[in-house]
Amino acid sequence: MMVEDLVYRYALMNAVKHKGKANPGAVMGAVMSNEPELRKRAPEVKEAVQAAVEKVNSLKPEEQQSEMERLGLEIRERKQKKRQGLRNLPDVKGEVVLRFAPNPSGPLHIGHARAAILNHEYARRYDGKLILRIEDTDPRRVDPEAYDMIPSDLEWLGVEWDETIIQSDRMEIYYEYTERLIERGGAYVCTCTPEAFREFKNEGKACHCRDLGVRENLQRWREMFEMPEGSAVVRVKTDLQHPNPAIRDWVSMRIVEAEHPRTGTRYRVYPMMNFSVAVDDHLLGVTHVLRGKDHLANSEKQEYLYRHLGWEPPVFIHYGRLKMDDIALSTSGAREGIVEGKYSGWDDPRLGTIRAIARRGIRSDAIRKLMVEIGVKIADSTMSWKKIYGLNRNILEEEARRYFFAADPVRFEIEGLPGPIRVERSLHPDKPELGNRILELNGDVYLPRGDLREGPLRLIDAVNVIYSDGELRYHSEGIEEARELQAAMIHWVPAESALKAVVVMPDASEIEGVIEGDASELEVDDVVQLERFGFARVDSSGERLVFYYAHK
C-alpha cells in the first residue's frame, strides 16, 4: 500500500468520525502514532495528508460512508461494545484467493500463526481458496526439514489449504517474466558495485546501466547465468526521486552460487522476494494479501512491478506489529542454540515454535482465538504467555482429567492409621461420565515436600494427620475435625500404587515426583490437571511418566 493510500484511509476515518470533515492535524497525528516507520518521512506524509484531507472533505457524507465500506474500514467508539470476530475484507469481487507464504528456514513459530490463521479464517468466511506457498528462493536460508515441518505445524493449527506451491519449482517462470520486464523497459541489468550504486541511489541519479537499450540488457541478462556472484543484478525501474531510497530501483534478481537443498546447482540466478511474490500473486490469482505494516515499502515496490507488466495488484491489507513479550521467536537464534546444545530441539519448551507450544499441551483453539481477537487492526498489539495461558485454561478446565501428583515427594508411614482407607474421586468434577479413580491408603503415603508444614494436615478426602518432627500421626477422619484443627489441605499419593513421574517445566528444568496409580491408563498427548500443581501434557508413558508443563 502506497503512502497516499494509507493516509487516505486515516483521513476518511477521521472525517466520518467528525461529521464529514477531516482535520489535517488529527490525521497527521494518527499516522505518526500508528505508523512509526513513516516518521522519518514526515514531510512527504504531511503533503499526502493535505491532499487526502482535501479529497475526503470534498465528498458528501454518504460518499464517505460508501468509501469506508468499500475499503473495509470501521470506526470503533470507545463506549461501544467491542466488535467480535474479524472485520470484512475490502473490495471483494468474485472468488477470494489468499496465501500463506512462509520462508522454509525452520518450523513455524507463534508469530507465523497470526498470518496462517487469519488467512484461513477469511478463506473459510468467503468460501475462498488458500494457497500454501513455500518461499525458498534464497538457498542459504533453507532448512530441508522445513518442507515437512511447515505443513505439519499448519495441520496442528487446524489450517486447511487448497494448494501447495514451492517457489524453487517455478524458476523458469521467474526467468520468463524477467525477460518480459526487460523487454517492456521496466528493468535493467546493473553491474555497478553495491557501493557505487548506493551513491547514485542516495543522490537520486541514474547509473550508466539504467540507460542501456533493451537488446543490450537482454544480452547482459543471458550472461548473468555465467557471471560470478555479486557481479550483476537485475533492477526494477522505479522513481529515482522517491522519498524512500529503499524503493529506488530495487533488486529483483541476483546471482547466488550456493547449492539449493532441492534443486542443487541447477540454478544460480534467483529472484528476490519482492519479485517472486508479485509474479506469483498475479499468476495464482491472489486477490487479497494480509501482511504486517512493516511490509508497506514492499507493497509499494511491488506496485511498480505490477504497473510495468500491466497487471492489477491485489488488495494489500496491512496490520500492526505483534509484540511478543517473554516469547523466544528468533529462528536463527533457536537453530544456533540447538547446534550448541542449549536447546534439545525445535520443540524445546523454552521456544515459541508451534511444536514446542503443542508439546506443552497448549491447544490450537487457544492460539486461533487469540489471533482472531487480535485481528487485522492497524495498531500494534502485544501478546504474552499470560494471555495464551488464560485462553488455554478455559479449554482445558472443561476436558482435563484430574490426578494427584506429589512433586519432590517425601514418603511417610502414617502412625496409628486404623485400617485401609479407600477414596473414590471423580476424574472431572463436572463430567461424571468420565468415571472415577480409586486411591487405596494402607499406611504409606507420598506427600509433596513443598507443601509440608508442622501441625495438622488434611489429606484431601481421606484423613487428618499431625506432622511433627518428620513424622505423620493419624488424628481423625472427618472433615469437621479438620476444620476444628484448621488443618492445611494437602494432596497425596498412596505409596503402594504410586508411579514415578517427571514434569518438564517451561524453562526446561525437571521436577521429579510420583503420581497416583490410575495414571497408568494415560496415553501420549493426553493433557491432564495435576491437582494444585498445574496442567500438563503426557509426553511419554510406561513405568516412568514424563509430562510437559503447560501452566497453572
UniProtKB/Swiss-Prot annotation:
A motif ('HIGH' region) lies at residues 102-112. The keyword Phosphoprotein does not apply. InterPro entries: aa-tRNA-synth_I_CS, Gln/Glu-tRNA_Ligase, Glu-tRNA-synth_arc/euk, Glu/Gln-tRNA-synth, Glu/Gln-tRNA-synth_Ib_cat-dom, Glu/Gln-tRNA-synth_Ib_codon-bd, Rbsml_bL25/Gln-tRNA_synth_N, Ribosomal_bL25/Gln-tRNA_synth. One of its GO terms (cellular component) is cytosol. It is an enzyme of class 6 (ligase). Its main location: cytoplasm. Signal peptide: none annotated. GO terms for biological process: amide biosynthetic process; glutamyl-tRNA aminoacylation. Pfam families: tRNA-synt_1c, tRNA-synt_1c_C, tRNA-synt_1c_C2. It is found in: Cytoplasm. Keywords: Aminoacyl-tRNA synthetase, ATP-binding, Cytoplasm, Ligase, Nucleotide-binding, Protein biosynthesis. One of its GO terms (molecular function) is ATP binding. It catalyses: tRNA(Glu) + L-glutamate + ATP = L-glutamyl-tRNA(Glu) + AMP + diphosphate. It comes from the Archaea. Belongs to the class-I aminoacyl-tRNA synthetase family. Glutamate--tRNA ligase type 2 subfamily. Catalyzes the attachment of glutamate to tRNA(Glu) in a two-step reaction: glutamate is first activated by ATP to form Glu-AMP and then transferred to the acceptor end of tRNA(Glu). This is Glutamate--tRNA ligase. It comes from Methanothermobacter marburgensis (strain ATCC BAA-927 / DSM 2133 / JCM 14651 / NBRC 100331 / OCM 82 / Marburg) (Methanobacterium thermoautotrophicum).
